[in-house]
Curated annotation (Swiss-Prot):
Pfam family for this entry, one: Pox_TAA1
Disulphide bond pairs: none
Ranges in coiled-coil conformation: none
Task performed by this protein: Acts with RNA polymerase to initiate transcription from late gene promoters.
Similarity comment: Belongs to the orthopoxvirus VLTF-2/OPG126 family.
Name this protein carries in UniProt: Viral late gene transcription factor 2
Subunit structure: Interacts with itself. Interacts with the late transcription factors VLTF-1/OPG093.
Highest taxon of source: Viruses
Amino acid sequence: MAKRVSLPDVVISAPKAVFKPAKEEALACILPKYYKSMADVSIKTNSVIDKCWFCNQDLVFKPISIETFKGGEVGYFCSKICRDSLASMVKSHVALREEPKISLLPLVFYEDKEKVINTINLLRDKDGVYGSCYFKENSQIIDISLRSLL
């Protein structure tokens, strides 16, 4: 039988079996020799904090941000609709913490932008809203369908 040994001065805070060292940022791009890099640019993110990044309205209250996978925040938005709409556009480029629930096309698509902005303002404080928009190619109309279970 094995003898039990007590070590009162030894503290195991992170055993190697469960401790995983934090990795630095992954390499961005590794090209084989037969490829030629045509552009390699690093640019800081937008620093505008007084306008919504989606609808460009003035932010008169505390803005909402997109939460990233690593716990950071990106962007400044006036509503969850604006936040989720932009998040659905950038989710293939930005690692998001959660899947966006709303997806609208950029305002440049709409002839009557004020109608879209009025919808955003009307539903700004509503919880549980989800949905999307649908482009009807034959009639060149965009149907916005937002719903709630609450």
